[in-house]
Amino acid sequence: MATVNEYRQHIQNLLTERAKLVWDDRIQAQTIFDTERDHYQLVYVGWRGSKRLYGTVLHLDIIDRKIWIQQDGTEIGIANQLVELGVPKEDIVLGFDPPKMRHYTDFAIG
């Protein structure tokens, strides 16, 4: 059984690796790790010409020993990456899905 500390490390590693994939040098990928309250985010900040770019790409929380994915703007899906690292599906909640729809997935309901 994985520990919360392992979950923290997995999340931080995945967000750090994802931050290296910025496609434009005018865009900053910022990782935000609140390890006391278990909130983790990857945010893009910058400008493309006169257009402001700002957005949360990934937002994960650890709540009651489960990983809650609040936002996932990736194609591969961070839930799949967590499973590949050995995190059981019953410890991952797709928080961006409505609660009444979560039982249709292989992941935790909440």
Q: What do these predicted regions represent?
A:
Residues M1-G110:
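Terminal domain-initiation and capping elements
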